[in-house]
Amino acid sequence: MNSILFLLGIAAASGLDAGAGYDENRDGGPTETPASDVSGDGAAGALSTADAKADAPAMGLLSGRVLTKGSRGAVPGAKLTATGTTGQRTTAESDDDGQFEMTLPCGAHALDVRAPGFEPLSLNRDACSNAAPLLIRLRARPNMPVYETIVVAPSDEPNLVLQRQELTTTPGSLGDPLRTIESLPGVATVAWPAPVYAIRGSNPGNTGYFLDDVQVPMLFHLALGPSVIHPYFFDSMAFYPGGYPAKYGRYVAGIVTAKTRAPAEDGLHASADVRLYDAGILVSAPWPDGKGSKEGKGGVTTAFRYSYTGALLSQIQHSVHLAYWDYQVRADRQVGEWRLSLLIMGSSDDLAYDLEAGSDKREYAIRFHRAGLRAGRALGKGRFSAQLTASADHSTAPIVQGYPITVDAYSVIPRAGYQHVTEHVDWEAGLDGQAQWFMPMAGVPMASTSDLALKRTALLAGAYGSAAIRAGSRLTLTPGLRFDSYTIGDTTRSDLGPRLAARLLLDDKTWLSLSGGRFSQAPSLAVQIPGAENFGLRLYGLQTSWQGAFGIGTRSIRSLEIEATGYLQRYVLTDMRDPTLKNHDPWSADFLVRRDARSYGLELMIRRPQTERVHGWISYTLARSERALGGGVLGPSDWDQRHILNAVLGYRVGSYTLGGRMHVNTGRPVLVRNDWDERFQRLPTFYQLDLRVERRMVFDAFTVDVYLEIVNATGTRTVLGLDQDPVTGQTTENSYRIVLPSLGIRAEL
């Protein structure tokens, strides 16, 4: 740690710190003179006569940059006011790179620097005695983070957006942005700490995840691993529990879309983090020839993470082998009128363990790689963008015990769209598709009636259009239409999905929202497994859903934002026919079944933004998820949790942030059978308390964050299911207790 601080200190020493104290606003004084209106050539005033030159004061050029203290990020729009001994004021404003210039008479000047969200800074400076560029560092206000969380439905699409800072500091998430999903309304965690989520009563495999519009086949590393994307590679995340935009498709539940951080264009930035479980690094820098010019402007961001806990665990428990790593690269470049962006990412997991002494090992190996090139430019009065992504997946996993399958899958994914903005209507239209080749090698007889274990080709194509129509100052309507075509093997199916979103402002702080539509998806397993997708179209047909949601929200109560949403969704899904898994053959035609389903509920979100000293949210979900079991019988789905409550709280005290999360959910149903009866029995209610404390130390050119987090500090046991004695029929709980501590340190410059 000392060596990291020493190296960062050397980097910081290369710049000149303004280093002056802080001052309050000063009122009064003579008329301000903009810097551009002050005459001068750096030595004397440019007057037209010799006498005027003799009487004019000598002039000097004061220039420099305004940066964020602790991160070296540029502060655009900072207002600088220089007041001379005569009371004359000269003003300037920093540009997008934080740079500024002002011409001043020689002599002492009081320089006042202010920017929204930062503490004011005052210092004294003589433009003539020291011509070196001035480096000014502003400290962000403790109660005003630079990155604010927004949980507001925009005018055209209802959703929930989390920005960078909240993604990595939510208690219970272990600093992992994607784990914040489990604290949001409408989300049921199947069995903590496994990151498997059922959204609004659907199967976990019915929700899609996208990074910069590139579909990610899995969210998390195996076992208790983090997400497959470096946490500081994210910029924002949007959550659509239902009614998602028409530009996305092929999932019948909701989607999660994440955006990556744009590469730095103002200089080298780097961060390194070390945790109990792994270590990672992220480096971002501009192109060497692009700084300060439009042509070639852009940069590169790279991230890599490696887990060393697998090696430690393997040494402690010889029957377990665990290892994972991941990488991400984003490169942006301006080429003429085109903005190019290249995204490359990949992940690898290996897990092997013995179920019991003397038994065969269960082995998992999951790897995926994605490379996508996106190009965009202004075209007419709108913007055109095109993207081409190539992917390679490899999976070795026993879908059920005794039936391992190894699959290699390759894909080419094109996408193109056009957005047009006018005074009253914003519309967009586009095309997308996917060509996918599966080459499985299964350890089962190939006389299977399912094509999941067979070589196959999938060709998917979609077209969409939507328009945000502003009907006056209060009402926005967003109709949309999407067409999807699915060809798997020799079978083709298609679906037309109308969609509608609406938002009505009752006043400046209260609104009504509505969303709904039809969605489709190829058959899928209940839980996503890379390579085990796009199969069985001939046997099961398309999965479909009709969704509808209505909400009301307000910001009229102090600094709170409150929103309540009711929803109803009807599905046709591919489900496991027998939840007790008496039939263990995943290749048989009746392992999966086409089944009608229904879910409905109420979601409540009460939030105080992170700009407040006390911040956080409370989310509550009252839900019911049902499946048609045949013969007119409705039963609860495997993921049905009636009540889900999350309370997330953070409190800033100086450089410390204290946080906690309380989670409670009622149990899922489990089917219990004997010779004369079968019934659903609920698992026990699960609750947990998560605690987090973090300290941020801000130096001139870098920051250091040290944090301690304890997840499930209550030590509550997770009941995974029920084991039933085949003779007596008595049940016992299959449970475990896990407490996850995390101690970490992160340095960023």
List each language-model region with its residue ranges.
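Gram-negative outer-membrane beta-barrel transporters
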Residues: 471, 567-570, 590-669
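Periplasmic N-terminal accessory/gating domains of Gram-negative outer-membrane beta-barrel systems
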Residues: 38-40, 47, 95-97, 117-119, ...
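Outer membrane beta-barrel strand-and-loop segments of large Gram-negative receptors
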Residues: 411-417, 454-464, 539-541, 547, ...
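C-terminal beta-signal and adjacent terminal beta-strands/loops
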Residues: 664-671, 695-749
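Short, acidic Ser/Thr/Gly-rich low-complexity loop/linker segments typical of extracellular
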Residues: 83-99, 103
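Surface-exposed extracellular loop regions of Gram-negative outer-membrane beta-barrel proteins
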Residues: 215, 350, 439-444, 504, ...
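Flexible loop and strand-edge segments within Gram-negative outer membrane beta-barrel domains
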Residues: 309, 320-321, 339-384, 388-411, ...
